[in-house]
Regions:
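Short alpha-helix boundary/capping motifs
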Residues: 57-59, 81, 118-119
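Vicinal oxygen chelate
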Residues: 1-8, 12-20, 49, 51-54, 62, 65-125
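Core segments of cupin and vicinal oxygen chelate
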Residues: 9, 16-59
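N-terminal beta-strand motif that seeds the catalytic metal site of vicinal oxygen chelate
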Residues: 1-26, 74-76, 123-125
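Short, low-complexity Ser/Thr-rich regulatory SLiMs
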Residues: 42, 64-66, 124
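A short alpha-helix capping/helix-coil boundary motif
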Residues: 3-7, 28-30, 64-68
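A short beta-turn/loop motif at secondary-structure boundaries
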Residues: 43-46, 68, 103-104
Length: 125
């Protein structure tokens, strides 16, 4: 990969999630993590074919599930300024607890499962 070219603003590896109700996933990430919408292509008036958000300097791509493209979930690890605050925002936006905030050897960490079945490991140091 000596001549690898990556478009500006992207990483070499990026998660690509297929979720049910991608528009609600977009709102969840904005409300909980401060995500910024970068791109959105609609399949129909209500279904997202492809979308991208930025959280910090990272990109997550996602789309609505279809009969051809089944739901694909992920476990995501995210550093935040305040684990407890983001954890509470997640719960307020429909997430459930995987692990309540607790001090760990690597920082303060919590786990939530969002309404789309993705697990987010939230950590502040």
């Amino acid at each position: 990969m000596e001549n690898l070219k990556i478009p500006e603003g992207y990483q070499q590896i990026m998660p690509y999630l297929i979720v049910e109700n991608a528009a609600e996933f977009l709102n969840f990430t904005k409300n909980v993590f401060g995500a910024v919408e970068r791109h959105k292509t609609m399949r129909t008036e209500t279904l997202i074919m492809h979308a991208e958000i930025s959280i910090g300097n990272c990109v997550i791509m996602f789309a609505d599930a279809t009969p051809e493209h089944h739901k694909q979930n992920a476990g995501l690890f995210i550093y935040v300024d305040n684990c407890d605050t983001v954890y509470e925002k997640g719960l307020a936006n429909g997430a459930t607890t995987v692990m309540p905030p607790a001090d760990q050897s690597y920082g303060r960490s919590a786990g939530i499962r969002d309404p789309f079945d993705n697990t987010w490991w939230i950590t502040s140091v």
